Each structure stands twice: as structure tokens, then as C-alpha cells.
């Protein structure tokens, strides 16, 4: 490989590493969590695991599997990038042990081996950098490998509290549905009803914030229908409509508050994931169907 071509390959490797780091930062620490590669991989795994008859377990595993695929994609991209950085310089920029030199080493596979070993912070010592900039580059990759491991653990720790809050809201809505809360609100005067609806609106706002911050939570399906917000969201719509028809001013206000929170949540779903472009009820019905639950209608 010529000197100019070698530096071009090195430049491509640096670009791959920087693009991957940008994606990691945007996925994990950007306020809206919008990493290009991560988001594409998540959506692809989600589409591959769309609900099919008899594949319930596969649907539940779609979210965790997608996260694993994203992390593997990040690791693979960084390893490939650093491989391209090292490859043109193996002949002159590294000391290769006598055992390896006897077998005419110094090709792409050796660069890949060096990149993988460095990424894993193992450092066997059979290929050692000698040029000054490479003596800096190799430890930098090792630091990136450790940082990526830490980031992957942080990612998991970030999203599971958001999933817990979403499931808690879903279970609360499921309990209200099983308690015939919609009928009670329509036919009886319940003193605590307005406060209940305001609390539901607040929890829905928190869920919307979580989905904005951790977009990957959308791709997590819940095994139990009672714990799935996609299956329970219609109850919130029915409660809001029932409250808006109440003769009590506080109930009508609470109903409008919940209805507005639902509209904002539906707008986020439609803008980021569904793109059906319909009413709030239509978007929420699409959300329910996308997670593999039957659409019963909001009444």
C-alpha cells in the first residue's frame, strides 16, 4: 500500500470512529436520544420482530435484543475504524514479535487482531506501537473500549426506571378499567375523581418525557397486557371523554387536562415512530396495534 493511500485509509478509519462516537453520544446523552445508527438498528430489530401468531416471547425480547445489537454494532464499528487506522502502518509503525514476523504478518487480519485486543484492553504485547502518534492512539482506543463498556451499562440503568414508570401507569389504567371507572364517572358523582384524572395526566406527562429522553423504550413490549401502556391507553381516553361530559366544572377541567396530555403523547408517538397523521384516537389506536394488542375502540 502506498504512503498516500495508507493515510487515506487511516483517515477513513478516523472518520468511522468519530461517526460512531457521535452516534453513541447522541443516543445516550442527547436530550432527545437521537443517534442515527442506534435508532436505525432499533427500528430494524423492531420491524423484524413484529407481532406474529405464536411468537409472543419473540415480541417481548425485541427491546432487549435490539439494545444488544446496537451495542455490538457500536463495538464492531469502532473496531473496524481502528483497524483501518492501524493497517497501513503495521510494517513501520509497530514492532511485531519474532514469532509473528516469521509467518509474514502485517496484513489486515493482524490490524483487526490488534484492534480487537486493544479494544478489550488485553494487550498481549506481540504487536507494539513504535511511532509516537501510534503510542498515543493505541491507549486511546483502550480507553474508548472501557468507556463504551461503561456507557452500555449506563444505558441499561437509564432506561429501566423509565420502563418501570410506564408499566406502573399501565397497571393503574388497567385497574381502573377492571373497576368500571369509566361507567362510574359517567353515572355517579365521585369526589376524588378530578384529583385522580389530574394524577393520571401528570403520570402521562412523565411517560412522554421519558419517551423523549429514552426513545429506545418505545421498542420494549410488555409481556402482560395489564402492564402494557399500549394496551391500556384507551382507558385514559375514555376517562377523559367521560369527565369532559360531567356537569362538574372541576371534572371537565380535569378531563380536558388529561385529554391534552393524551394529545401531546400521541403527537410525540406520531412524529417519532408511527407517522399515521390522524387524530389522537387514531394515533393511539396505531400505537396499540403496533405493540400487538387488539384495538377495542375508545367509545
How does the language model describe each region?
Residues 177, 181-192, 196-299:
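Soluble C-terminal extramembrane regulatory/interaction domains of multi-pass membrane proteins
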Residues 13-24, 74, 82, 100, ...:
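Pore domain of cation channels
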Residues 60-83:
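Membrane helical hairpin/interfacial module
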Residues 28-56, 97-98, 168-173:
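Membrane-interface amphipathic/juxtamembrane segments adjacent to transmembrane helices
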Residues 6-34, 66-74:
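Transmembrane alpha-helix/interfacial motif
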Residues 1-5, 18, 22-26, 78-99:
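Juxtamembrane "helix exit" motif at the C-terminal ends of alpha-helical transmembrane segments
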Amino acid at each position: 500500500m502506498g504512503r498516500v493511500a495508507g493515510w487515506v485509509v487511516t483517515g477513513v478509519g478516523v472518520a468511522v470512529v468519530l461517526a460512531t462516537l457521535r452516534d453513541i453520544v447522541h443516543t445516550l446523552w442527547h436530550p432527545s436520544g437521537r443517534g442515527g445508527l442506534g435508532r436505525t438498528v432499533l427500528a430494524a430489530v423492531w420491524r423484524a420482530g413484529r407481532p406474529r401468531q405464536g411468537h409472543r416471547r419473540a415480541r417481548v425480547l425485541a427491546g432487549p435484543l435490539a439494545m444488544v445489537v446496537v451495542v455490538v454494532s457500536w463495538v464492531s464499528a469502532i473496531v473496524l475504524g481502528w483497524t483501518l487506522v492501524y493497517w497501513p502502518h503495521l510494517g513501520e509503525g509497530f514492532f511485531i514479535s519474532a514469532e509473528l514476523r516469521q509467518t509474514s504478518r502485517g496484513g489486515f487480519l493482524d490490524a483487526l487482531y490488534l484492534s480487537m485486543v486493544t479494544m478489550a484492553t488485553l494487550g498481549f504485547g506481540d504487536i507494539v506501537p513504535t511511532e509516537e502518534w501510534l503510542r498515543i492512539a493505541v491507549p486511546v482506543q483502550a480507553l474508548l473500549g472501557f468507556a463504551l463498556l461503561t456507557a452500555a451499562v449506563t444505558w441499561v440503568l437509564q432506561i429501566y426506571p423509565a420502563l418501570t414508570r410506564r408499566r406502573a401507569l399501565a397497571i393503574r389504567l388497567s385497574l381502573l378499567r377492571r373497576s368500571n371507572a369509566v361507567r362510574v364517572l359517567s353515572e355517579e358523582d365521585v369526589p376524588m375523581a378530578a384529583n385522580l384524572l389530574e394524577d393520571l395526566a401528570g403520570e402521562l406527562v412523565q411517560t412522554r418525557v421519558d419517551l423523549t429522553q429514552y426513545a429506545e423504550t418505545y421498542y420494549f413490549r410488555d409481556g402482560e397486557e395489564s402492564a402494557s401502556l399500549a394496551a391500556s391507553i384507551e382507558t385514559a381516553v375514555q376517562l377523559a371523554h367521560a369527565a369532559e361530559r360531567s356537569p362538574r366544572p372541576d371534572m371537565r377541567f380535569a378531563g380536558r387536562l388529561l385529554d391534552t396530555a393524551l394529545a401531546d403523547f400521541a403527537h410525540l408517538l406520531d412524529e417519532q415512530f408511527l407517522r399515521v397523521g390522524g387524530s389522537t384516537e387514531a394515533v393511539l389506536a396505531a400505537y396499540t396495534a403496533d405493540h400487538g394488542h387488539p384495538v377495542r375502540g375508545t367509545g
